[in-house]
Amino acid sequence: MKNIFLIFFLIFGMNSSFAEEGKEKPNIEIFQDWIVSCNTDNKLCIANQTIRTDKGLPVALINITHVAGNTVLEFGLPLMMNLQKPIKVVVDENMISTYGYNTCSQSACFVIRNNDEKLLDSFKSGNKATVTAESIDRKRFDLTFSLNGFTNTINKLEGK
């Protein structure tokens, strides 16, 4: 569990360091609907896909890292979700699993999966993933992510 949170903080530390003035910009590659950002020596990379509103504001995201043989998939979901109700992940109409929340920050709540081969394999073979969450006022939200380019994204993260 320590490794999950270490990677979680590496992800956010890496993202914020990219934004710091005077720092070199990350190397960015696009694999269809996924973006991979790496530091300048390509030793630390993060892949993500973000669902945005019509005005461009982020609603939800999936971040993926691969560090020291661990592939971590992180769902970032809006605040005000019912944390007692796990999210449900469906890939191409096939129920994969339900997952409880791990933590929340000031901007989002997170479900973190470490080396979840069933989830990763289903993403590699699928076309779309739908994450269903429930708000605190019991409204259901279906958030659909494209899986186009996911396998190439994972291959990049794993150095293949």
Predicted features, each with a name:
Residues 4-13:
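Sec-dependent N-terminal signal peptides
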